[in-house]
From Swiss-Prot:
The gene is rplP. It comes from Microchaete diplosiphon. Gene3D superfamilies: Ribosomal protein L10e/L16 (3.90.1170.10). Signal peptide: none annotated. The keyword Transit peptide does not apply. It comes from the Bacteria. This is Large ribosomal subunit protein uL16. Keywords: Ribonucleoprotein, Ribosomal protein, RNA-binding, rRNA-binding, tRNA-binding.
């Protein structure tokens, strides 16, 4: 599972997910992509489950790029703990995703295979997503 090797600070504030994604919203590496339609925190486990579903489906052919990285620690307090006495310990890592962000890219496979692989990956994610095709690829077919 993905997580940072080291961070400057152990804990972060939650923040807000307002507006659209400007960075990471264009297709850069592959020919097909999965784009987020809603804001969400995507955990490293969800990213890994999606990656496994895609790689299992496309087998040897093609290449996958993961365009998001879980760099935000989410803290939790132990169950049945009284209020106060500080913030909890980091439990897992999330990637903050805004609408329009490209999540995964695929190249080296046909559109049908890519579409099905992305559909399997999208099932593992807690948000609505959209399948995107690079414009040059559409013209060739």
């Amino acid at each position: 599972m993905l997580s940072p090797r080291r961070t400057k600070f152990r804990k972060q504030q939650r923040g807000r997910m307002e507006g659209l994604a400007h960075r990471g919203s264009t297709l850069n590496f592959g020919d097909f992509a999965l784009q987020a339609q809603e804001p969400a925190w995507i955990t490293s486990r969800q990213i890994e489950a999606s990656r496994r579903a895609m790689t299992r489906y496309i087998r040897r052919g093609g290449q996958i790029w993961i365009r998001i990285f879980p760099d935000k620690p989410v803290t939790m307090r132990p169950a049945e703990t009284r209020m106060g006495s500080g913030k909890g310990n980091p439990e897992f890592w999330v990637a903050v995703v805004k609408p329009g962000r490209i999540l995964f890219e695929i190249a080296g496979v046909s559109e049908e295979v890519a579409r099905e692989a992305m559909r399997l990956a999208a099932y593992k994610l807690p948000i609505k997503t959209k399948f995107i095709v690079r414009p040059q690829v559409q013209e060739q077919e």
